[in-house]
Amino acid sequence: PEEVLLAKQIIKHHRWASMAKFTRGGGEANALAIRIARSNTKNKNVAFCGYHGWHDWYLSANINSKKNLDQHLMSGLNYDGIPKNLKNTSFPFPYNDFEYLEKLIHKRNIGIIKMEVMRNLKPENNFLKKVRKICNDKKIILIFDECTSGYRENMGGIHLKFKIFPDMAIFGKALGSGYAINAIIGKRKIMKKAENTFI
């Protein structure tokens, strides 16, 4: 019952969402979100911005170049143990560089965009609005990783302050006040696909 109560409370804070799932850690939540998103689209490639954990989908970006993740919080991450066939499935893009992202979407057939709403930089030149629009236009699933930013400055995700709403969002850290809990929320039509895969 506590899980249901918490899910209802988080959804109450995020009216655009209608379903929630829970994990223990942020890396697990990120991997789960990617799996659910990929089950919703034929275009499995991911464009991302920011730090999103240690799972294969994320670290595979460094197969092309060990410097790919250098601008995403942690540099010099080794991809040993990551299957080489994951090469060219996840691609980083710089925050606030919409032109770069737009080219990446066309070049790499991107089906999912996963990003931190903000970390040490604020969005400029309607960056978040442009990202949301291109996701709408290209039928790309937009995931906001709010493990770090959620429930710190406001009651919910920091994306609420900008009035830009994703298809899925992830929360952790402040959500549990020190306890190991993360939440993935999303639109019903997307989250329902979790029932068709093993989670």
Predicted regions and their residues:
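Conserved N-terminal phosphate-binding loop of PLP-dependent enzymes in the Aspartate aminotransferase
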Residues: 1-199
